C-alpha cells in the first residue's frame, strides 16, 4: 500500500509543467523584490477616470524620447490589429516560456501579443493582467530603425526610448514584455491574471548613432508639375551720364550673385547633424519646361536642404544722348517648383550596420532665371551746361 501511494505521488509531481515551475519562480521573485507596499510605501497609484477612458482611443504617433521631439517620419509606427501579424512587427524571443512575443499596445498600455494565446494584447493594468482584442502592434517598416534593449532601474529611461504614450514606455524583463511607468519608477509585467512590478528592466531603444546617410535611386514624377514664375525683379541697377554735346557709347557691366535653394524632403526622418549625400539628377526649372540633368552627387551638411550661390555678369553697350542720364538694370525672375519623387534612404551606423528603406518625398527648388539687362528711358541732366 505504501508503495502504491509513493508511485501516485511521483506521477503527480511529474505532471508539474515547466510553466508552473516558472510561475513559482516569478511568484518567489515577486515576493522577494516586488511587493507594492514594501517598495512604494503604499499601493500603486490608481488611474483617473480620464486616463481610463483613453484606453479605447487612438494615441499619438510613436515618439522617441530625446532632446527634440521624434517626428512622425519615423519608420516605427503603431499598426491597428486586423487579424494578421503585419510585416516587420517588432518581437522578442521569449526564451522563458519558449515562444515569440510581439510588442503591442491597448490605448497607452504596452504589453505583448502571442499567437499561442489568441488574437489579444495582454497588458498590466490596475494590479491585474488584462487583455483586449482591439489593439495596435509596433511595426518597424523595412526594419529600418536599429532597435536595442537597454538595461535600466528605478524608472530611468534611456535617451531614445520608445514611448507608448505619456510616461509609459515599451519595456521587458526576463519573463516577458510589459510597460515601464516612469512616474511610478517601476516596470510592470502581466503574468497569468496578475500585474507584477520590478525595479530592474530593459527599455526598447532606438539607435541614433548614424555616421552616414544617402539618398539614391531618385525618380522624379513630372506628371502635373507646375513651375511658378514670379514677376521680373531688379537684381542690380546703375546709371550712366553723358555731359557731352554729342551721343556717347559706353560699355556697362552688371554683376550680381543669386541663391538657388533645393531640398529633398523625404517621408522618413533624416538624422540631424549627419551629412547627407544625394545621388540624383538635378531639375532645372528656370524655363517653360523642366529638364533634369545627368545624375550627380550633392553633399548636404544639414537636413535635406542645400543653398548655392550663382554669379551673373552682363555687359551692355549703351548709347547715351547729349546731356542725359540713362538707367540700366539687371532683372530676373524667380522660379519655384515642387516635384514628387521616390528613392531609397540608406544609413550607416558607427557599429558598421547598414539599413535602408524606400522613401517618397518632394523635391523643392527656388531658382532665379531669365536674367537680362534693361536700358530704361534717359532723362536730361538738370544742371548740365547747355551746348
Swiss-Prot record:
Inhibited by tissue-kallikrein inhibitor TKI and trasylol. Plasma kallikrein inhibitor PKSI527 and classical inhibitors of serine-, metallo-, thiol- or aspartate-peptidases evokes a minor inhibition of the peptide digestion. GO terms for molecular function: hydrolase activity; toxin activity. Contains 4 disulfide bonds. Pfam families: DM9 (PF11901). Keywords: Disulfide bond, Hydrolase, Secreted, Signal, Toxin. Expressed by the venom gland. Shows nociceptive, edema-inducing and kininogenase activity with release of kallidin from low molecular weight kininogen. The cleavage occurs at Met-Lys bonds. Belongs to the natterin family. This is Natterin-4. It comes from Thalassophryne nattereri. The lineage of its organism: Eukaryota, Metazoa, Chordata, Craniata, Vertebrata.
Amino acid at each position: 500500500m505504501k508503495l502504491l501511494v509513493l508511485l501516485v505521488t511521483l506521477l503527480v509531481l511529474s505532471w508539474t509543467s515547466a510553466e508552473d515551475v516558472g510561475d513559482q519562480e516569478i511568484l518567489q521573485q515577486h515576493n522577494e523584490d516586488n511587493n507594492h507596499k514594501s517598495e512604494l510605501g503604499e499601493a500603486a497609484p490608481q488611474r483617473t477616470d480620464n486616463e481610463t477612458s483613453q484606453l479605447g482611443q487612438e494615441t499619438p504617433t510613436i515618439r522617441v524620447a530625446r532632446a527634440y521631439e521624434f517626428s512622425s517620419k519615423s519608420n516605427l509606427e503603431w499598426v491597428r490589429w486586423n487579424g494578421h501579424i503585419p510585416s516587420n512587427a517588432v518581437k522578442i524571443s521569449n526564451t522563458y516560456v519558449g515562444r515569440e512575443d510581439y510588442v503591442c499596445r491597448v490605448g497607452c498600455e504596452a504589453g505583448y501579443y502571442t499567437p499561442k494565446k489568441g488574437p489579444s494584447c495582454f497588458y498590466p493594468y490596475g494590479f491585474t493582467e488584462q487583455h483586449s482584442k482591439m489593439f495596435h502592434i509596433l511595426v518597424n517598416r523595412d526594419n529600418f530603425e536599429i532597435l536595442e534593449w537597454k538595461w535600466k532601474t528605478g524608472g530611468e529611461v534611456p535617451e531614445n526610448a520608445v514611448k507608448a504614450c505619456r510616461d509609459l514606455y515599451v519595456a521587458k524583463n526576463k519573463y516577458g514584455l510589459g510597460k515601464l511607468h516612469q512616474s511610478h519608477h517601476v516596470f510592470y509585467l502581466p503574468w497569468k491574471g496578475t500585474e507584477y512590478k520590478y525595479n530592474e528592466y530593459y527599455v526598447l531603444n532606438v539607435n541614433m548613432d548614424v555616421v552616414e546617410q544617402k539618398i539614391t535611386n531618385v525618380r522624379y514624377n513630372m506628371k502635373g508639375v507646375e513651375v511658378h514664375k514670379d514677376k521680373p525683379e531688379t537684381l542690380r541697377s546703375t546709371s550712366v551720364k553723358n555731359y557731352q554735346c554729342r551721343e556717347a557709347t559706353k560699355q556697362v557691366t552688371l554683376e550680381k550673385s543669386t541663391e538657388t535653394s533645393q531640398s529633398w524632403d523625404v517621408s522618413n526622418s533624416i538624422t540631424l547633424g549627419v551629412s547627407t549625400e544625394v545621388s540624383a539628377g538635378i531639375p532645372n526649372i528656370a524655363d517653360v519646361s523642366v529638364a533634369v540633368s545627368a545624375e550627380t552627387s550633392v553633399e548636404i551638411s544639414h537636413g535635406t536642404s542645400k543653398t548655392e550661390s550663382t554669379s551673373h555678369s552682363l555687359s551692355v553697350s549703351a548709347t547715351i544722348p547729349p546731356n542725359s542720364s540713362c538707367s540700366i538694370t539687371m532683372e530676373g525672375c524667380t522660379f519655384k517648383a515642387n516635384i514628387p519623387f521616390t528613392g531609397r534612404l540608406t544609413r550607416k551606423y558607427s557599429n558598421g550596420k547598414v539599413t535602408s528603406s524606400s522613401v517618397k518625398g518632394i523635391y523643392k527648388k527656388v531658382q532665379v532665371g531669365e536674367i537680362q539687362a534693361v536700358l530704361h528711358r534717359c532723362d536730361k541732366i538738370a544742371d548740365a551746361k547747355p551746348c
